[in-house]
């Protein structure tokens, strides 16, 4: 019956893709986020103000402790010719980034004064500190008359929503805002002409057209607000002056600690900005770029490296080195193993091996082990001591999963991805000491765990046990399945572990891991390639089984990347998962709103696969689309695009599933895949499931056949699909 499968593949390849009008790249995102790996903050271009300041990059320290939002808003104002305005009332002339740095830059104007503002978190400190610098330039023809710069910061140190029971005092040249949450420091540079705080509300004073009045103590009150004023009257035409405010937070109320953090960042506005720029220049000096990037691609590429840097925790402690899935205020500021793996792969490719090693060291030192045994039915989850979280981590480096009515997510795909990261890191650096230091975690508690997860018999014999995998389908009631993605990552990881074993002289282990990878490859091909020569989502899904995550089979060498299975599956996804916007695809055919968005990581993985299949004409438009969209949206890459409009959706910016996927796609365009990126033609394929038999199938056709007769025959001969298995991942996060 194999000829029926070949005929179906032939018909799929020959059928034209659905005609779709393509949405043009356009702007749809307005928030500029930044971090220093400790504090995070964001500026909303539409609202023309800082709208977020958080004490941590991560969402939760532990199950009981959420990261707090410390800001309502903050912004500058100007007085020109005796006329006051808060800059929230002036449209920006431009907004974006200060060259490649993680420094937001916004330009606005009032009268003859132009304000160039810079917002950033200094990497010179590991304290939660955010800096706002304003450079005021007189663009008029005469000296500035009756002119000033204002600043207001509405932060939250109290109880409840943070506004209850605050007290602001002028102490040692700065405002201290204290409450139940701790100390918020408002440190002006240089000393202001005036410093006001509630009840002398600076917002109302400026709106009334006057100047600020000096305040010393607000008393305990709700929603207290401080502000500053600097006089710039007499500023000559063409001249500029800079002013700055450093915002810092200490939960223990330690002013001395915050003073030290401010001093490390800089003691003048010029020093604050120059040190931050110098730090970012030093970072980019350690990076490398793939050859042949266009100017737009280089801009987007560099921004992704900045995002990856800012997504990594720099706080001391067990969480140090973890990489968030997104920057806050996006809600995926959580360290998923899978997302971190894609981010780490990109760091290694870009030459940022110090950051990559910090991420790997985090994995090796994290606290895990909550999901050895047993589930509600008495069966194992992992079934053995393991080294990596089954899903993600809290900010303190402890394991976290998420549960709903179908139980927890328990995912095995991260194990293989992490092993591949380690092997790639060692290939790039020669750091075999990392392998010997963490040999137990890498070999016994990860690679051997994968080998132990292989099903011994039954319909799934030879496959990795059912799990929740990439789309987080949960554990019970049909959620866990033998997903193609997990099989592919496990093959990748076992081959990578064989390389690691070879490097430290463990030849017998290397042979054992290679044999396990080969056996798993054969089993996966036998079980997960349909008679129609397509890779299906899982063993359990016998119909409606399109899942773009199965691209791992192509990217990691379970099937020849340019064989009939690869090309037929790519074409099936291209047609069956097309989005109305006319560019990429959605992630699977489950039908939920989240599923049916366009997934940027999927687009980039498909670009890799199409290129490896010899179809650069399919790969290049995907990269070009994401690049063009990013260029119009501050070079940031989101989790999703709206399936109809192409607008940004989901969390922005994404690290592993955004920045990491884009960086790797550009590297794979110009450099061959790594040691485990492909197999010889037909490797691991059995006669009934995988490789082309050379008998004149679709990939050997010499001409361009008429498509529709073949399609009609194929439809007539293929049996009616059985009713699909209901998936359980409709409303869960993509992983």
Regions found by a protein language model. Name each.
Residues 706-723:
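A cross-kingdom C-terminal cell-surface attachment/processing module
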């Amino acid at each position: 019956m194999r000829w029926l499968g070949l005929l179906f593949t032939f018909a799929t390849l020959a059928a034209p893709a659905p005609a779709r009008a393509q949405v043009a790249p356009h702007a749809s995102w307005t928030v500029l986020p930044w971090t220093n790996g400790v504090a995070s903050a964001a500026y909303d271009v539409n609202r023309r103000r800082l709208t977020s300041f958080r004490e941590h990059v991560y969402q939760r320290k532990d199950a009981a402790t959420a990261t707090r939002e410390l800001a309502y808003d903050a912004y500058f104002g100007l007085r020109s010719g005796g006329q006051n305005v808060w800059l929230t009332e002036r449209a920006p002339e431009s907004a974006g980034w200060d060259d490649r740095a993680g420094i937001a830059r916004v330009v606005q104007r009032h009268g003859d004064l132009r304000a160039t503002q810079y917002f950033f978190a200094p990497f010179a400190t590991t304290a939660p500190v955010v800096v706002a610098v304003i450079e005021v330039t007189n663009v008029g023809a005469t000296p500035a008359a009756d002119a000033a710069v204002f600043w207001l910061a509405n932060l939250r140190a109290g109880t409840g929503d943070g506004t209850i029971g605050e007290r602001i005092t002028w102490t040692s040249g700065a405002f201290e805002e204290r409450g139940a949450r701790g100390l918020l420091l408002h440190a002006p540079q240089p000393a202001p002409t005036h410093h006001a705080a509630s009840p002398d509300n600076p917002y109302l004073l400026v709106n009334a057209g006057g100047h600020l009045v000096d305040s010393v103590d607000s008393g305990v009150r709700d929603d207290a607000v401080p502000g500053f004023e600097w006089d710039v009257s007499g500023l000559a035409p063409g001249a500029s002056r800079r002013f700055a405010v450093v915002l810092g937070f200490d939960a223990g109320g330690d002013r001395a600690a915050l003073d030290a953090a401010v001093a490390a960042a800089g003691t003048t506005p010029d020093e604050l900005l120059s040190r931050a720029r110098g730090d970012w220049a030093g970072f980019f000096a350690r990076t490398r770029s793939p050859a042949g990037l266009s100017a737009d691609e280089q801009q987007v590429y560099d921004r992704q490296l900045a995002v990856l840097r800012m997504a990594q925790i720099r706080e001391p402690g067990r969480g140090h080195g973890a990489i968030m899935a997104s920057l806050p205020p996006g809600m995926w500021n959580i360290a998923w193993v899978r997302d971190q793996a894609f981010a780490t792969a990109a760091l290694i490719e870009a030459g940022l091996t110090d950051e990559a090693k910090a991420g790997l060291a985090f994995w090796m030192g994290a606290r895990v082990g909550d999901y050895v045994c047993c589930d509600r039915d008495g069966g194992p989850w992992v079934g053995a001591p393991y080294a990596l979280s089954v899903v993600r981590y809290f900010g303190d480096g402890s394991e976290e999963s998420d549960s709903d009515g179908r139980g927890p997510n328990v995912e095995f795909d991260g194990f293989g991805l992490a092993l591949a990261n380690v092997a790639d890191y060692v290939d790039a650096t020669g750091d075999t000491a990392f392998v010997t230091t963490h040999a137990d975690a890498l070999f016994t508690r990860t690679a051997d765990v994968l080998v132990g997860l292989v099903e011994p018999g039954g319909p799934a014999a030879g496959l990795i046990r059912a799990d929740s995998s990439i789309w987080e389908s949960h554990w019970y009631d049909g959620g866990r399945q033998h997903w193609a993605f997990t099989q592919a990552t496990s093959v990748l990881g076992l081959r990578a572990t064989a390389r690691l074993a070879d490097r430290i002289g463990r030849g017998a282990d290397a042979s054992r891991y290679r044999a396990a990878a080969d056996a798993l490859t054969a089993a996966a091909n036998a079980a997960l390639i349909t008679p129609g020569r397509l890779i299906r989502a899982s063993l359990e899904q016998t119909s409606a089984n399109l899942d773009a995550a199965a691209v791992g089979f192509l990217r990691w060498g379970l099937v020849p990347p340019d064989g009939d299975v690869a090309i037929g599956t790519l074409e099936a996804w291209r047609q069956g998962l097309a989005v109305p916007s006319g560019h990429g695809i959605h992630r699977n055919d489950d039908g939920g709103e989240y599923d049916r968005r366009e997934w940027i990581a999927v687009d980039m993985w498909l670009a890799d696969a199409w290129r490896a299949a010899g179809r650069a004409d399919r790969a290049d438009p995907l990269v070009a689309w994401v690049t063009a969209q990013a260029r119009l949206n501050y070079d940031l890459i989101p989790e999703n695009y709206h399936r109809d409009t192409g607008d940004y959706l989901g969390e922005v910016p994404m690290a592993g599933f955004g920045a990491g996927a884009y960086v790797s796609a550009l590297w794979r365009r110009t450099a061959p895949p790594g040691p485990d990126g492909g197999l010889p033609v037909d490797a691991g394929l059995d006669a009934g499931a995988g490789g082309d038999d050379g008998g004149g199938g679709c990939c050997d056709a010499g001409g361009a056949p008429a498509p529709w007769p073949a399609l009609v025959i194929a439809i007539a001969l293929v049996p009616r699909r059985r009713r699909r298995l209901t998936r359980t991942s409709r409303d869960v996060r993509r992983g």
